[in-house]
Amino acid sequence: MALTQRANLTPGVTVSFLHALWLAAALLLLTGTARAAQFTVSGPSGSGEFGRSVATLPNGNLVVSDPLFDAPGPIVDVGAVHLYRPNGGRISSLRGSSANDRVGSGGIVVLPNGSYLVRSPSWRNGAAVSAGAVTFVSASSGISGEVSASNSLVGSTAGDQVGSSGITVLSNGNYVIVSPAWDNGTAVDAGAVTFGSGTSGVSGAVSAVNSLVGSSELDQVGREGVTALSNGNYVVSSRAWDNGALVDVGAATFGNGATGSRGVVSAANSLVGGSGSDQVGYCCVIALANGNYLVQSPFWRSGSATEAGALTFGSGSTGVQGVVSSANSLVGQSPSDWVGYQVGLLSNGNYVVINPFWSNAGVFKVGAVTFGSGTTGVSGFVSEANSLIGGKAFDSVGEEGIAVLATGNYVVRSPGWDNAEFENVGAVTFGSGTSGISGLVSPLNSLVGSAAGDRAGSAGVTALANGNYVVRSPFWRLGTVAEAGAATFGSGSSGISGAISPANSLVGSTALDRVGSGDVVALGNGNYVVVSPEWDSGSTSNVGAVSFGLGTSGHSGSVSASNSVVGTRQDDRVGAQGVTALSNGNYVIASAGWDSDTTSDAGAATFATGAAGISGVISSANSLVGSRAGDRVGGFGVTPLANGNYVVRSPEWDNGAIVDAGAATFGHGATGISGAVSAANSLVGGAANDRVSADGVSALANGSYVVVSAGWDNGGTSNAGAVTLGLFNGSVTGAISTANSVQGTVANQAASHRFSYDPVRNQLAVGQPASNRVVLHRPGIATSLSIVGDTPDPSAVGEPVLFSATLLASQNAITDGRVSFTASSGESCVDATPTATAANVAEFSCTLVFNAPGSVSVVAEYTGSLIHAYSGSAAETHSTVQVQVFANGFEGP
């Protein structure tokens, strides 16, 4: 039965792959439990925090930081960043030279081409403490030696902290370094933003020659960040920039993504404010999908109106320069209008400006929502002519934002809107994504409540995959029934208007049912699920309900057990821990407070299909459940996997008498899993308070996943922690062990563990800085690979060279997988047909051709097996010579 379940885990896989998976599972069963190979990379002598961060590059190499590394002497905490091959062989080491340089303490940034950047904001430049440095490093060869101005971008003054505010990677692969604390001569914290090439980096001291810089004290250029545009360009936000005697006018500076922007910030190269404290670019610069952008300046002054606010449209190819005004921006006209405070981006590239604080001719805070074109923007004063507005003080139209629909249209939420009779009835207004909507909010253009405090749309609007939407109004009143709640379906092409009612909504029937209070979850197939954990079943309070709705027509009427899955006991609160949508359209309901017939708070995780949903009561027949009081299965939610499967997190699950051992349970995305949690179907802890899965489950792109359990005890070492690689087929069950996990060795240090995954090699790298090591975990039977021949050696330029490698397995015949040979000069070849030479030995070979003389380094790697683990060879040096033909016909070197 287990084999059948595991063989059908991934919908759409080919028959041949399923057959191979069957064989792999059968072989593993024949040889015992699943195996894994582990290889420990220990920190070099002097290491103090080796493994603080671990990053896997696209080529499989590993970057490991050790910011507390001590140089010989010792010189304490100079820091180091190392590059390793996937097999654990060290390629290079970059380190600091002065005490407390802490190279790599700012983190590692991986570029799209695989090169990476090392941030060292505490690096010392001579007498300048914390000058800071950012070092560009090749993904293949790394860099060895000390950080310096010759290999890094560096600061020149104490406290410059180059790179301290991050690095923005542009869409074209280049990057921008932000250093707001950089000093420009005597101008302390003038700030600098430096462009770097993604292929060659940037080095030397920061200056106006290579960077965009401020010129006044505390300009702090770039402090609000750098926004990458979709076309490769970028925009720098500097709200504290001073224009001469005008303090904090702010600036937003356009940068060319191919060459960068350099020199001093000014009105000639930037959008700037016209008054002190305008703080242009205060919060953000927002990138539009087409490459254009918007600058938010909610504190901009309009004449005598302080903080009227402005939102400015900028071209993604040329930017926008000069002073903010009503001619180039959408602006407010009353004090504290704060126009530009919030913006919603539509799926078609247009945008909506949300101004809930806007006042209309003395009527305070009526609110306004203004449509803008993504190609031309919108300018002028906010008004009823260009905006959807409220009619009464404190209507605050748009105060809860907008919902963006897949059709390109949008929905405005205004729960504080008042009708003619009552306050806070609320309104939800549909708007066209090509032309917007203007005028007053009313029942003619909006879905509205009917009673005071209904606050229509207060809990949110959920956009469905097919473009339609669902409005959540948990405080809606049904006649005399207070807070019955409602979930209302709306068309994504025309919206819905008028009053909420049982005729157009799914509603509660008892006071405080608050239908929709938990959530409305959009499924991948366009349908949806309404979560109402406070719903009452007759006189039994808070049993909870989760109701399925069709994405084409919605769901109306009262919630009941006939149209919803419900609890049966008080405070079951079905769905309280959320509903998780799977990528295949199905879903899983987490209800940690569910009681079985005999056990309180056993908890349940209920699988349902996205085509028809599920109704009736929760039970062990339709759900994964706990067995003991307080198991609270699903209490930490459900993690969806990339292949449509899922993992249920239950760190409070008891393993028999072992309290809070914890469990992580794999579920099939097509059929789910039901019955009691156990070691037979879950990864489990073996000691009290192991709390397996409490610290997260991370989904990987290939359908596998990583379980983090910081509270796991390694024998007598408490809270040593474990990081588990769960395979895409759900085969990782039972107790945590070295066969499935990387285990910690130091008490109470699991929070410092860091992991990185390599999908090509199926290798999990876990940094354990408290142990000064990185552990490489490779599922499968251990192997060892060696290059045994390169014939001929040396070879002539253009001559085929046959490379051979031998793979030795600790167990089982080698029947699958492939070996790739890769030269440091870029040549590569692959052999995917193993030739058996002994019981557990196979040979692989293929041909490389070198077209230039010289020596190259060649490595081999074994990957792609369902049974055996990855391994890599040591490097083999091969020489190629240029052959000359003499007049007599003989060849020579």
Predicted features by range, described:
Residues 1-17:
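N-terminal secretory signal peptides that target proteins for export/translocation
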Residues 779-892:
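Solvent-exposed beta-strand/loop surfaces, strongest in extracytoplasmic domains of secreted
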Residues 30-780:
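Conserved beta-strand/short-helix segments
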Residues 9, 65, 110, 178, ...:
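Selective for proline/serine-rich intrinsically disordered segments
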Residues 7, 13, 46, 60, ...:
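Intrinsically disordered, low-complexity segments enriched in proline/serine/threonine
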Residues 12, 31, 889-891:
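Short hotspots in intrinsically disordered terminal tails
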Residues 16-31:
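Bacterial N-terminal signal peptides
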